[in-house]
């Protein structure tokens, strides 16, 4: 029999404690059911801000755990970003960082060049995905290359499926293909509510760059 007093006689503080206790028990049961321990595939997509930012946050977390990490940026190649400046200054064998893109396709206006850059980026990414030394791999803006068909989805799905069992992979970019979403463990879709750019505010260092 519960030692809790009837709810109608509880004080607001007692009701709050009861609600929090029920919530804790529910969360504890969910945690107890999660017994599988393996690498996960995370996909960040959508038209909102935060896809790459989330990926780089997980990169920082992984480095903090002492993981061997690899980054391949498929698009962002013609302008400097704060994340690249920060992570490149880490003088550690923990991190391999590659910026392979030549900018967005409307900047190059050269499809053959864009395809070549994407294929070169994918070659490095595929090596990382096959290498058990890498605990965490971030493939930033790979979805853009998939949407443009500069990299073939079948290649990516095969490499992800065959990767070392404890390797975590994060893929970012809008327009994630359905086939990638289907095999991912965690998928987050960022949605725009408001964006400063629409009000004429240019991209800001520390926020977008």
Write out the residue ranges for each language-model feature.
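Short glycine/serine/threonine-biased micro-segments
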Residues: 37, 46-48, 171
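Extreme N-terminal, non-catalytic leader segments
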Residues: 1-40
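Conserved P-loop
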Residues: 41-130
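Short coil/turn connectors at secondary-structure junctions
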Residues: 38-39, 66-67, 133-134, 165-166
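Generic detector of well-ordered alpha-helical packing
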Residues: 74, 141-142
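Short gly/ser/thr-rich secondary-structure transition/capping motifs
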Residues: 24-27, 118-123, 169-172
């Amino acid at each position: 029999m519960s030692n809790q007093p009837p709810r109608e006689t509880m004080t607001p503080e007692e009701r709050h404690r009861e609600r929090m206790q029920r919530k804790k028990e529910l969360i504890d049961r969910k945690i107890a059911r999660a017994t599988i321990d393996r690498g996960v595939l995370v996909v960040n997509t959508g038209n909102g801000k935060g896809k790459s930012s989330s990926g780089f946050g997980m990169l920082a977390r992984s480095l903090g755990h002492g993981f061997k990490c690899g980054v391949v940026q498929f698009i962002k190649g013609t302008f400097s970003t704060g994340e690249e400046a920060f992570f490149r200054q880490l003088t550690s064998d923990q991190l391999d960082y590659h910026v392979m893109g030549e900018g967005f396709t409307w900047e190059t206006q050269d499809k053959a060049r864009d395809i070549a850059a994407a294929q070169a980026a994918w070659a490095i990414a595929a090596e990382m995905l096959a290498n058990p030394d890498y605990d965490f791999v971030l493939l930033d803006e790979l979805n853009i290359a998939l949407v443009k068909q500069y990299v073939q989805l079948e290649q990516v799905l095969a490499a992800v499926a065959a990767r070392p069992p404890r390797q975590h992979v994060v893929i970012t970019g809008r327009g994630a293909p359905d086939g990638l979403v289907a095999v991912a463990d965690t998928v987050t879709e960022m949605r725009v509510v408001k964006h400063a750019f629409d009000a004429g505010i240019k991209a800001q260092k520390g926020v977008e760059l």
